[in-house]
Amino acid sequence: MSDARNNRKVYRGRVVSDKMDKTITVVVETTKTDARYGKRVKYSKKYKAHDENGEAHTGDIVEIMETRPLSATKRFRLVDIVEKAVII
């Protein structure tokens, strides 16, 4: 049982929205190698993550971890705020 818990996906991304109550939207940018030409192509994906205390704000770099379904679209939870956004 503990092995299944340790195999959860952990992603690092940037918060693009914190307007919802206890929910943040995180963009995870990664690269994929093109099958035909071998060129590395950037792509991004948005995930909704549970933020219990409302700690993360737009622009922060965060780590999110896979968890049980918390709502119709939420499958991740906030683990750590790696870097706070600089507000000018």
Curated annotation (Swiss-Prot):
InterPro entries listed in its UniProt record: NA-bd_OB-fold, Ribosomal_uS17, Ribosomal_uS17_bact/chlr, Ribosomal_uS17_CS
SUPFAM superfamilies (UniProt xref): Nucleic acid-binding proteins
One MF annotation (Gene Ontology) recorded for this entry: rRNA binding
Superkingdom classification of source: Bacteria
A Pfam family annotated for this UniProt entry: Ribosomal_S17
Disulfide bridge partners, by residue number: none
BP term (GO), one: translation
Keywords noted in UniProt: Ribonucleoprotein, Ribosomal protein, RNA-binding, rRNA-binding
PROSITE patterns: RIBOSOMAL_S17 (PS00056)
Signal peptide range in chain numbering: none
Keyword Iron-sulfur assigned: no
Record-level GO cellular component terms: cytosolic small ribosomal subunit
Similarity remark: Belongs to the universal ribosomal protein uS17 family.
Function: One of the primary rRNA binding proteins, it binds specifically to the 5'-end of 16S ribosomal RNA.
The protein's assembly and partners: Part of the 30S ribosomal subunit.
The protein, known as: Small ribosomal subunit protein uS17
